[in-house]
Amino acid sequence: MTTFSSSTFDDAVMREVRIEASPEVIFGFFTDPEKMIKWKGTEAMLDPRPGGVYRVNVTGREVARGEYLEITPYTRIVFSWGWEEGPITPGSTTVEVRLIPDGSGTLVQLRHAGLSGEGLDAHVAGWEHFLPRLAVAAAGGDPGVDPWTMGPPPDGQ
């Protein structure tokens, strides 16, 4: 069973989801380009090591870019985040993902900090859209075609 919880603070989005998959499997969905595009993006270039750069075409029109800041295999990933075009520039915000074993699954805790105003609202919507897709893909399912790749992206991104 997949369960979700969420909260928003002054400058951060916090989401928690329990996924029926091991931390090792879920880690791969953040570090392997072929796995990433199953839940987020149309193409991805990832160099998952501290100082390594990533570039993900998230919607077919909007490209996220940043740098991996910390990698602890199967436990924690921290990376900078921003958009190649738009008010939230690459490196201006930070995403932290924690993978915590939980019985036969994993508790995924995500914190995206450094956001404000419309950018905060847009990223709340973004993570609410993408984390359920991650849950399906990591558990071995098919989240289907991402509707965000077929139309205009949400405002503020």
Language-model regions: role of each:
Residues M1-M14:
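Short acidic N-proximal helix/loop "leader" segments that mark the beginning
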Residues F30, K40, W81, A138:
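Short, flexible helix/strand-to-coil boundary loops that buttress conserved ligand/catalytic motifs
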